[in-house]
Amino acid sequence: MEYTTLIARLKTASKSFVNLEMQLADPDIANNPKKLELIAKERAKLEPLVLDFNQLLDTDKEIDDSRQLLKDNRNDKDMELLINEELCNLEVLKNSLIQKVTIALLPKDPRDERSVMLEIRAGAGGNEACIWAGDLARMYERYGQKIGWSVKPISASESDMGGFKELVISIKGDSVYSQLKFEAGVHRVQRVPATESQGRVHTSTATVAVMPEADPVEVKIDPSDLEIGTARSGGAGGQNVNKVETAIDLIHKPTGIRVFCTQERSQLQNRERAMEILRAKLYEIQLKEANDKERSQRLMQVGTGDRSEKIRTYNFKDNRTTDHRLGSNFALEPILAGQLDEVIDACIAQEQKRIMEDFNENEN
């Protein structure tokens, strides 16, 4: 992006920021909580960009002043050396700020700010795959709790040997999808299962789907397309067994999608949760169809996000996690403890690089 074009876009963003601040000071808006919250969010999103823009303008002025000072001190070698050193530092800062604001101005995925439904399914590997699915669920739970998101299982099919055949987790918070969308795909584990008497390393897999939550307005569901049954929720026996049919078994006939929801205490709550999951699944189908139409012949470097794509291998023997999209290795234990920031940040940087390259190609 040419520098003059960049500055023009930053000036537009700065004007929008000033306008939002004026709206926040408007008594009428102050008395409208929903509108106030919306405007405050928009202002918060723009503030870092505007601060960086102001710093860029200040740096430009310092560079101009230093160049003038250099002209005025041509005969003073010591002063010339100091000014050139300062100019070098200012140019480095300017280039860093240009890269930062350019990335901030790149087109954003409109779904990035949404909460998600995260679905984990045991893949190849039998009981060990189910146990691995449970390990992944705990990893995401720890990551979400560390950030301050609300993490809640809303549908689960447990395995007799531990873990889950399938699990759907609701993760609510700010910009959840922007972080977790890179987790979609096949997660492979290489380790010696607890049930392995010979000490042999087994390879198992689990599939992760990350579905941005959809509003009812975005996904229309015809009630006649639904087949809804009820069942008793499973329990640990004794007083914990649910004698009332609170579980919901929901089938969307056109797609064959089935959702079995048992986690809530009442049938109504389970039905609401089942509909949330169904909407997210149907929304994911809509997005995939739209992306397939728009996608160019070249696959995204960060990965297609396809749930059949192997994205990561967790090797317990070598205490190593390999992200195949990045071609990078990470320590295993911190990753499983929910410390995913390093790998997710690297995926974000890779995606931003790709978007910037595409943007520059289109500009040319």
UniProtKB/Swiss-Prot annotation:
Pfam family, one: RF-1
Gene Ontology MF terms: translation release factor activity, codon specific
Main location: cytoplasm
Localization annotation: Cytoplasm
Matching Gene3D superfamilies: 3.30.160.20, 3.30.70.1660, 6.10.140.1950
Cellular component GO terms held in the UniProt record: cytoplasm
UniProt keyword annotations, A-Z: Cytoplasm, Methylation, Protein biosynthesis
UniProt-listed InterPro entries: PCRF, Pep_chain_release_fac_I, Pep_chain_release_fac_I_sf, Prokaryotic/Mito_RF, RF-1
Record PTM: Methylated by PrmC. Methylation increases the termination efficiency of RF1.
Protein's UniProt keywords contain Transport: no
Lineage top rank: taxon: Bacteria
Sequence positions bearing N5-methylglutamine: 239
Functional summary from the UniProt entry: Peptide chain release factor 1 directs the termination of translation in response to the peptide chain termination codons UAG and UAA.
Similarity annotation: Belongs to the prokaryotic/mitochondrial release factor family.
HAMAP family registered for this protein in UniProt: Rel_fac_1
Protein name (database record): Peptide chain release factor 1
Organism: Prochlorococcus marinus (strain MIT 9515)
Gene: prfA
